[in-house]
Amino acid sequence: MKFFALFIYRPVATILLSVAITLCGILGFRMLPVAPLPQVDFPVIMVSASLPGASPETMASSVATPLERSLGRIAGVSEMTSSSSLGSTRIILQFDFDRDINGAARDVQAAINAAQSLLPSGMPSRPTYRKANPSDAPIMILTLTSDTYSQGELYDFASTQLAPTISQIDGVGDVDVGGSSLPAVRVGLNPQALFNQGVSLDDVRTAISNANVRKPQGALEDGTHRWQIQTNDELKTAAEYQPLIIHYNNGGAVRLGDVATVTDSVQDVRNAGMTNAKPAILLMIRKLPEANIIQTVDSIRAKLPELQETIPAAIDLQIAQDRSPTIRASLEEVEQTLIISVALVILVVFLFLRSGRATIIPAVAVPVSLIGTFAAMYLCGFSLNNLSLMALTIATGFVVDDAIVVLENIARHLEAGMKPLQAALQGTREVGFTVLSMSLSLVAVFLPLLLMGGLPGRLLREFAVTLSVAIGISLLVSLTLTPMMCGWMLKASKPREQKRLRGFGRMLVALQQGYGKSLKWVLNHTRLVGVVLLGTIALNIWLYISIPKTFFPEQDTGVLMGGIQADQSISFQAMRGKLQDFMKIIRDDPAVDNVTGFTGGSRVNSGMMFITLKPRDERSETAQQIIDRLRVKLAKEPGANLFLMAVQDIRVGGRQSNASYQYTLLSDDLAALREWEPKIRKKLATLPELADVNSDQQDNGAEMNLVYDRDTMARLGIDVQAANSLLNNAFGQRQISTIYQPMNQYKVVMEVDPRYTQDISALEKMFVINNEGKAIPLSYFAKWQPANAPLSVNHQGLSAASTISFNLPTGKSLSDASAAIDRAMTQLGVPSTVRGSFAGTAQVFQETMNSQVILIIAAIATVYIVLGILYESYVHPLTILSTLPSAGVGALLALELFNAPFSLIALIGIMLLIGIVKKNAIMMVDFALEAQRHGNLTPQEAIFQACLLRFRPIMMTTLAALFGALPLVLSGGDGSELRQPLGITIVGGLVMSQLLTLYTTPVVYLFFDRLRLRFSRKPKQTVTE
């Protein structure tokens, strides 16, 4: 009692304490970063290696495998996947959450160095690594377009000047430049002209290499001067290479221009990028795993004017895509929802108390509690994100509860004629333990969440801590500031009611009287109530088993990502046409604002598209509805598929796939994997629970298989190395020399003229110069025929792997899809040599599903322990926890009604309900125990009186929590798909629990009291103290 008096009789100190809490909160708010969600990105590092012209199988065996063996020894690697395609290998390392990415990067570099001696000697450069997840959607895409400069020149500006500068910005993990390649001098050889002149392709390569040399020449000195020797040993442009003498034939000089077309072009002509039907170079910027997306985007935007000045005026630098506007809009929506919740909660208090003076007290307590929380959030390193702001929105109903309980009890004493300061002291003393019990038991709900590991635990930690801190500050405020304000502001008389509110007051009295009559009937028919309670428990179990489940609500971030997958034998020219066709279909959709895309590189039959939708207030459809509409139009394009998915703020794993969810097949037997993957993929494609089923296994690419006659080769004086060198020189875009410029290095690329690379009969024109100097046609010692070959080889760990990706059709959940996949695998009878498992987000969903029930049980057990300690009783906590089944039924039925799957957000709602609905029982049990202890009442009389006395605060606290959550249900706009499941769960649970627990709690209280007396050694002791 002295504790309460200390604050009630020292108003200045109490006010200054509250002001200090508020000022600290304001300061913390100003320094908090902004993010869409808590930081939950796994540390991911991508290792890249190249060997131009090498087949996917060669890259997998000679490059990927040695690197994987070395990288696999690094501590903390949770997953390692690789993909090898034509001339390129990419290895993705995903680390444990607690692994520092900078330390991991050092280990990766050491592992690359250790594997260097095992890698092919012909690699043009050492493997490199980047601290970014390639499967993440870019946080920003910049485009370069120009009517004056070529694509190669634009690419040079982008990769040489812009990308390095952007990479140095804090938070940027990777800048991927696409749409073309670096400028180069391209030598397109004419096989027939070479044959006529008796010049081999190796002769041309050697001549070019020897003619472009950058070596130190030394210096000359005499007694007084020193001269540096400089020669014209370098050739820079196509015009300088054109007259190069490469051979003499019958005394005549054969120049390069006689046997080849020499042009200033690009290193790889099989690349294309576009933005809104215009050729463009794309800079796709990804953030570091630990970086804040908003701060990173703001830093890039601040740098753009400076970047624009570094490139010519004829080049247009534009932002094609920016993830931050929808994130900011979503957070603004949550902030508005928070303000509405506060207003509704205060309105509830005003309606019940019917006094403006009394309403001011919780109207002050709520903002002090919420604002003070920002200081703790800053100290904990949190951010202002959708989850932390939703925690504050929900906290609105909680923090006002404590103030309501104290205020209502003090007001009751004032109405009885007690003096204000005495009423404040007495009222606070009576409910101080109740408020403490409610707050501690509510915080106890979140202890299992704080101990939960993995991504779900990291995701929910900010929510749990933010809400717990708000409740803790609310507890302090309700026991200090609230009674002080009551003692000094309220008067010892009944509050004056406005005429408009008298009707509401009479309605409350009528409700209370009606409740009293119905409660008397219930207490005389306890068995019926017991059956209802058991029925809610059974219904809970059935609803939880049957309700569709998913990991995280499907977000509408305003950004779509699309993966193009064409026939495996498609040419680059045809693939570029498919990209243009798909872009036109999407660009014509009224909901689309911007489209960028690219194709080419090592994966000739694939491409990527990034689509920015119009703001939510300018379109009526959600992202998923737009995808459903576009899917019908895109399906009409022959020979290729475009798979669209909405970009999410959470994406798990480093696999680049064409859909949101993945199912990976593993095998140590590559032949078995290639046999069963098509069967499984075709089966999954028929399932109605899945959409956009596709696979990264591509083993039906067109190949021209050459078979050497080694005996003939030996007789003709030709070795295999010479024959392979011929093919590489002719068709491998071989980089044969380097051009050194002040800002960059460029290549001289040699191959046969494009008209020959696009014609199979060009092999007939190929020849090799044997050891006698004679030109021997390729057809003399080799035969060729079309065959199938893999376009990519994929590994997970050191096993061969194939990942099947899929999206969810409208109305289907991830639990439906996972169950259907498990049934399909069983029906197919897949052998044990082929193992299937969910990957990425689907894998985390499986793990979360397995732990959900355990988490709920742990939360209930924690609350029971806390209540047992507070009440020094094994029985009364069970009475209080009997309120939970009805809340669970209401929450699950509400989700079913709104056709919302049970997600991680809904799980938060269930956890919150465990803390919310027991408050009613705590208020009843506390007053019943007090009445038995000091009023000499029977248990039935005590609980009946407690129910009637606490009816008004129970209704106030429940409606305050309900109205605090209601704006989440009704909210629209950006981010509403995250807020609504939480609001639906809480509102549904509160409505059902309020209808039932007002009756079930008294019955359970009497049941346990009789049970306690039956087993008690001291039957006369009626109250457990």
UniProtKB/Swiss-Prot annotation:
Single GO molecular function: xenobiotic transmembrane transporter activity
GO cellular component, one term: plasma membrane
Top-level taxonomic group: Bacteria
Primary location group: membrane
Induction field: The mdtABC operon is transcriptionally activated by BaeR.
TM helices/strands, residue ranges: 3-23, 333-353, 360-380, 387-407, 431-451, 463-483, 528-548, 853-873, 875-895, 897-917, 953-973, 984-1004
Keywords in alphabetical order: Cell inner membrane, Cell membrane, Membrane, Transmembrane, Transmembrane helix, Transport
Topology of this chain in the membrane: Multi-pass membrane protein
Gene3D superfamilies the record matches: Multidrug efflux transporter AcrB pore domain, Multidrug efflux transporter AcrB pore domain like, Multidrug efflux transporter AcrB TolC docking domain, DN and DC subdomains, Multidrug efflux transporter AcrB transmembrane domain
Location(s) in or outside the cell: Cell inner membrane
Family: Belongs to the resistance-nodulation-cell division (RND) (TC 2.A.6) family. MdtC subfamily.
Function noted in UniProt: The MdtABC tripartite complex confers resistance against novobiocin and deoxycholate.
Assembly and binders: Part of a tripartite efflux system composed of MdtA, MdtB and MdtC. MdtC forms a heteromultimer with MdtB.
NCBIfam families to which the protein is assigned, alphabetical: PRK10614.1, RND_permease_2
UniProt protein name: Multidrug resistance protein MdtC
Lineage, opening ranks: Bacteria, Pseudomonadati, Pseudomonadota, Gammaproteobacteria, Enterobacterales
Gene (name only): mdtC
